[in-house]
């Protein structure tokens, strides 16, 4: 379980990645690890494992859970320490990984797309850091569900930044439209 004094639980002092797994292999693993490393550095942490150790642990997790096609959730928190806003000087990070089977999108979703609503982007000013602090996303996704649509796209000053749990993509007249890479958004990978 998660310790009650884990800083990820107490302060959302943690970052995460979600990696697709297809035929037992992680999709774009290196890009996800690079983004995780960047997020960690931005919150003044270091990567707690090597890529080799990570691959071994993921292989074991996939085998034990019998997942061939699914998603891997990886969270790294600063670790356990008495509750204090100051970052502790000597602390070991906590790493949590889970896997689950993936339900692929339907052919209709691919063919027709999905309905979305737009909501004001009320997240903090560093969405380029993949922080576990997702309360604005949770509330926006709830708005989408209550409006019987698939997703809520977050809008900041008239610009679509991203969905609550998706990248924002529009195909119009055969042209793919998506927000350009920037610090104001979390750049998508997979």
Predicted segments with their positions:
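Ordered, amphipathic secondary-structure segments that act as subunit-interaction surfaces
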Residues: 58, 67-76
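Active-site microenvironments in enzyme catalytic cores
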Residues: 20, 64, 75
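A structural signal for short coil/turn segments at secondary-structure junctions
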Residues: 65-69, 147-148
